[in-house]
Amino acid sequence: MRQFVVLVGLPGSGKTAYQQKKSKWAVVSRDVIRQSIFGHTYEPAVEDAVERIFSTAVIEAAESSADTVCVDDLNLLRNERSAYVELARITGREPVAVVFPYDPVDELYRLVQHQLEELKASSTRLHVSAFPRDRFDAMLRCYQAVHPDEGFVRILKEDALPIVSGITAPEPVPRKERKRRQEKQHPIPLFAG
């Protein structure tokens, strides 16, 4: 059956890195909308427009022919997730939640800060907003754990924070240089007499 995957987790917990490994998924992400359309990681002045674009894109993706649709967002609140469960059912999809770790909190916050620094260093056109600890802590306080009675067919749990974040590219693996065999070449006798 076609799936509607809802990623659930704090910033830096590995949601984007997870979905980037799923190349055939149709993914809708507020972060991608903010960055690609508005050139910001977060800007309150454009959040209404981000929300309208995001909501439309989620509905379009759910109605598409894609086998798996994924919502890559925080999805920390039960009422946000219930809207996705309902949309999944209306569009004939199986709702699945993938929950990412939020502990250890200090390590997770450091990872987010590292990701933002890397993003700032790698993109000259993108305005990277600060992400203060009190905003992060407020997100943590409002987080409502995913419960089986929410209507998800499956609730999957990722156990570890990402080693490589959704922003950080893995280190390239050095390749061994191949050497060609040097064989003595003999001319082909085309006009042998």
Segments and roles (model prediction):
Residues S13-T68, V105-D106:
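Conserved substrate/cofactor phosphate-moiety recognition/catalytic segment
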Residues R34-S36, S55-A57, A97-V99, T124-S129:
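Short, surface-exposed, polar/charged, turn-prone segments marking secondary-structure boundaries
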Residues R2-V8, S13-T16, K21-K24, Y102-G193:
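Conserved GTP-binding G-domain of TRAFAC-class P-loop NTPases and closely related GTPase folds
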Residues M1-R2, E94:
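A structure-centric signal for secondary-structure junctions around beta-strands
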Residues I37, Y42, V46, E80, ...:
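Solvent-exposed, flexible loop/coil residues
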Residues V46-Y102:
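Glycine-rich phosphate-binding loop used to anchor ATP phosphates in small-molecule kinases
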Residues K21-K22, Y42-P44, A83-E86, L111-H114:
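Short, glycine/charged-enriched secondary-structure capping and boundary segments
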